[in-house]
């Protein structure tokens, strides 16, 4: 029964990942999340049910639009598969229903923010601020850490990034501060320190590899959000 539920969560994650793709594409552009329906951004072709199957339709169509032949962005199957695997992994590591629900919500926020930052270089207030609020709410109703730890974690996360911004005169932004505040609100101050340290390591290594592969200039801005999100997921699952 446990395996069946895990498989169900994986499938749910695939479906939710499909919705997250809509948010990732439309929210930064100021578009409605409801209208118009899913369509090819190149030719406007409205997608049919068979073209909306998570991961499967991408493979079936060989990564191209059936109408115009335009390449479908790799992000679509990546987000769907990542969310499916993530949902199943969170169930595997959760010891209670409340921990599972909180984990799924937190992971969902991280996925959306990471890919928006990766593509657009922003971390929208429409997601970060409600994310902080949800972290506080779960603490208040007793589903996670004590309220004082949630509040302290959010303040520490926000304050650390703001301090770095002021001292370095750039390099990070207020969106990064709010994302780390989300981490603190959900997981507490210890998670903030862990995530900031390992995100810095991951961001440095990843940044060097990115510049080497793309041959871009060292002044090219590299989003920090994905590194923080990755470190936060590791903390959520294993610590």
PLM feature spans:
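Interhelical loop and helix-boundary elements at the membrane-water interface
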Residues: 30-31, 65-76, 115-129, 166-178, ...
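Functional transmembrane core segments of multi-pass inner-membrane proteins
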Residues: 9, 99-202
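Transmembrane helix-loop-helix
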Residues: 89-102
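Structural signal for membrane-spanning alpha-helices in multi-pass inner-membrane proteins
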Residues: 25, 87-91, 110-117, 135-142, ...
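Membrane-proximal soluble regions of multi-pass membrane proteins
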Residues: 20-75
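Alpha-helical transmembrane segments
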Residues: 6-21, 80-85, 165-170, 181-239
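Short, strongly hydrophobic alpha-helical membrane anchors
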Residues: 1-4
